[in-house]
């Protein structure tokens, strides 16, 4: 028998698990507790339909006559902030509409939260991983990489002199 309980306290999930073997017999009762802290995943806020204005306009660019005469470009405007997003990624009007709405929610999130937005967090995570890779390579290879770079720069300097 396995009993599990989850509680949400201040954006932190605490998981508790209780293993019970042969609950009827008091002597053979065994239980294990563990707690783990996990942050809740970042959720983009849903935009209100009243705040969004959608229009479909004719496409521009390569694609010939078909793209120039059909209205497949989705243009979505967030009225309170004035942010406008266009999408012409696919040939389908509905897919372009979905893509434009997704981009608009990301832009509004970035506008409202700044460095705390989803895109900023992704960039911070990428920068952090890049620094970790560089640190690991320096630990592994030492100054060999720096020596190679300096020798290349010295060779270029010698060629400039000649």
Curated annotation (Swiss-Prot):
Residues 128-142 have a biased composition (Basic residues). Residues 1-18 form a transit peptide. It is found in: Mitochondrion. Keywords: Mitochondrion, Transit peptide. The keyword Calcium does not apply. GO terms for molecular function: peptidyl-tRNA hydrolase activity; translation release factor activity. GO terms for cellular component: mitochondrial inner membrane; mitochondrion. Residues 128-162 are annotated as: Disordered. The keyword Signal does not apply. Belongs to the prokaryotic/mitochondrial release factor family. This is Uncharacterized peptide chain release factor-like protein C1105.18c, mitochondrial. It comes from Schizosaccharomyces pombe (strain 972 / ATCC 24843) (Fission yeast). The lineage of its organism: Eukaryota, Fungi, Dikarya, Ascomycota, Taphrinomycotina.
């Amino acid at each position: 028998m396995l009993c599990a309980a989850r509680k949400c306290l201040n954006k932190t999930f605490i998981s508790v698990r209780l293993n019970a073997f042969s609950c009827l017999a008091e002597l053979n009762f065994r239980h294990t507790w563990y707690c783990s802290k996990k942050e809740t995943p970042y959720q983009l806020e849903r935009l209100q339909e009243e705040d969004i204005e959608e229009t479909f306009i004719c496409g521009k660019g390569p694609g010939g006559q078909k793209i120039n005469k059909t209205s497949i470009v989705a243009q979505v405007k967030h009225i309170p902030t004035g942010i406008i997003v266009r999408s012409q990624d696919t040939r389908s009007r509905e897919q372009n509409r979905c893509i434009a709405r997704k981009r608009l929610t990301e832009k509004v999130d970035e506008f409202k939260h700044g460095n705390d937005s989803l895109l900023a967090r992704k960039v911070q995570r990428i920068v952090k991983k890049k620094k970790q890779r560089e640190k690991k390579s320096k630990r592994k290879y030492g100054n060999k990489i720096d020596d190679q770079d300096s020798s290349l720069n010295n060779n270029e300097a010698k060629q400039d002199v000649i």
